[in-house]
């Protein structure tokens, strides 16, 4: 039934855009139960981007296999800095250290899950440091090897508060 729904959606895309569905960017977020459907064999066309998700605790649940990396749609990651849900919510407080973000997004980069990165940030103010690191790393992962992570925080603090307070 779900695969029929995907086929119907693609037909609607073609009807509404006048283009073949494969020429219109599409994403399938493998979040929570949807990843379970995928693991049990549900598939979408190869031109659809597979968006791998974290476990709501900053651990990417799964990354693409070599066969999945060969799909023309590619792969990406949906990541959380803010989460509301069971068994515990975390808001208004940064609970994801920069090294953890680096580790997980570095894995995503190594496994070619880099076509799209989305981060759920919740409230912006308490997440300034992780948001900026996430975007900086996404822009140029090679510029930020693990050895430079302490330098990142020093540079950020110097810019925000002055070198004497960094």
Q: What do the PLM-derived regions correspond to, one by one?
A:
Residues 1-72:
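Gly/Pro-rich turn-and-neighbor structural signature
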Residues 54-58, 64-166:
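Structured mid-domain segments that build the active-site/substrate or prosthetic-cofactor binding neighborhood
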